[in-house]
């Protein structure tokens, strides 16, 4: 996008001086992507962004989707993007993404326009109470008054600096800056002026932020590591469970911890360890499916569990750990919030994962190699993998487990993976090919909603400046059809598994009740060919595993976005999962 020549202090009126200061300070702090939804009251923000030479503006008509796209950038880049919207219900559309960002610790800047004080609570058009509208789901919020010659413009700079500090410091999360504007909203000359103090003038001639904050970092590991090391010293029957890990360094450290202890490592899809780790003797990529065997569960209760990183998707694993009642269950993560839905955690180490692992390894002797305990877990996982691979190779029909395994086998190394909530994240966590290539995997598992998934994938592509493979269900895609507009300029290959409704409910007890159909199956009878055409996306509808391989490879080679629709049957899908898990259980127990 072409920009006009930029001088931050060259503003036609006080409103534009403030918005230009705000945008410049955000850019200096590393915010370069602004997701802008159209609106009138936000005109001063939008124009300031459009004119800034280093601000990339992404336009999207759906405020909810734009907010999820900003969330996606934060997930991929671990730094915030800004969401910009006008006043009124437009602001409320940011709540779902703010909730997800808050619960899962994703940095994000909510930049909203508002009416001035004299129009609040007066019945003025498009005016609602936006102060603290996001409640406790934001780490910090500011209600910025209209520009005035009685307020030092340095206030704008220090507010921006504080917002960026609050969104990045542990625990990371969204912040809300609510900006009141009076008319005129357009960049027109007015008689009003704001004096520029010497300090702001000096700042304008430089390139550094006005207020420097230290790089936010979690506390270094302290005495709690000594206590934890003492409790697990000499333990052979332990497990390392890898939840969501946000960096390669954290993933490498977690792998090193398992190797040092000689403990099996059960990785979540979002741990950066679920795929590409087949040669690691401690790796148990099919841990969820191994636990289908009651005999294996009963014979392999861990005495100690080291859970590293954020949440993991497997309910089966969580219940196994709960029922095993380990003497030690420690969570190691750079966040003070608890992950303990079953109230079994005995230790919480709040520290950066690499630092915590270094501290633990330094305090613990190297564990034995080739123990029966480790080999039992790894061997069971290998046998499960053989069953899954046989299903992929022998099936002539497209099934949900096959799609998950096939995509992760074929995924190019430059692609990241995005898994929608509901069945896609579960199928990928269970059936993904462990030896496949590809980049990190992402999923909105903070609040686990299905909304905004397409927009999140687009934001991840934007944030990592690289292609994305998205696996999504039909209801989640219907929920975010507008998000397909964001795929026109960002390479996202979206594979939608269309089983005509809510397939996950076939796995829940409600299926035995009369109200199951249609209240939970929610059949809709639609396909997505016309949706792809509406947004000018190439469309494929493969009818066999070989056709899916071909369509996916073609879409990836193109370097552009595409929509691939895979039709499956909900009832058959449940039967396929049951048969596959029965085969898995036999394979585990026959070992």
Curated annotation (Swiss-Prot):
Cofactor(s) required, per the database record: Mg(2+); Mn(2+); thiamine diphosphate
Catalyzed reaction equations: isochorismate + 2-oxoglutarate + H(+) = 5-enolpyruvoyl-6-hydroxy-2-succinyl-cyclohex-3-ene-1-carboxylate + CO2
NCBIfam families per the UniProt record, alphabetical: menD
EC number: 2.2.1.9
Gene3D superfamilies listed in its UniProt record: 3.40.50.970, TPP-binding domain
Keywords per UniProt: Magnesium, Manganese, Menaquinone biosynthesis, Metal-binding, Thiamine pyrophosphate, Transferase
Protein name listed in UniProt: 2-succinyl-5-enolpyruvyl-6-hydroxy-3-cyclohexene-1-carboxylate synthase
